[in-house]
Amino acid sequence: MFLSTYENKIDKKGRVSVPASFRSHLSNLGYNGVICYPSFNNQSIEACSQDRIEKLSASIDSLSPFEEKRDYFATSILSESMNLQFDSEGRISLSTKLLKHAKIKNSMLFVGQGQTFQIWEPAAFEKFKINARKKANLNRASLKWEKHFNNNEGK
């Protein structure tokens, strides 16, 4: 699972180190890299495992081939996705297109989202986070809590 937030800088060759815990999780899934694509929800880069992008692809494929929504999702996600392999030091090279989308210049935040993570320009993420916390507070009653405990833990 991808948890926490880490800040890393782009080196002179345009590479950035992916946090060790994120690389470890991807490696445990049998993948030595990450799939990245520009978010269509916000000004970030979406990042996920090979398995996750295959699930997204299957979800898109489940739509009728003649449905416009299928083309919208395939174009916005699959055609924009990049398969980035880690080098020997756990770094990736994000394309200029991805960096421009997120307005990243020298430093970026790797933001854990559970099964995925996002890559943000730090100041943009801080603004987003403030708004997200407000909206989470307003919508907290809609978060479902399944009881997974035999004793009364987690109530």
Swiss-Prot record:
Keyword flag Aminoacyl-tRNA synthetase: no
InterPro entries the UniProt entry points to: MraZ (IPR003444), MraZ_C (IPR035644), MraZ_dom (IPR020603), MraZ_N (IPR035642), MraZ_sf (IPR038619), SpoVT-AbrB_dom (IPR007159), SpoVT-AbrB_sf (IPR037914)
Annotated ranges, domain SpoVT-AbrB: 5-52, 81-124
Superkingdom: Bacteria
Gene Ontology BP, a term: negative regulation of DNA-templated transcription initiation
Principal location listed in the UniProt entry: cytoplasm
Listed GO MF terms: DNA-binding transcription factor activity; transcription cis-regulatory region binding
Keywords attached to this entry: Cytoplasm, DNA-binding, Repeat, Transcription, Transcription regulation
Cellular-component GO terms for this entry: cytoplasm; nucleoid
Subcellular location: Cytoplasm, Nucleoid
Subunit structure: Forms oligomers.
Entry's family note: Belongs to the MraZ family.
Alphabetized HAMAP family for the sequence: MraZ (MF_01008)
Protein name in UniProt: Transcriptional regulator MraZ
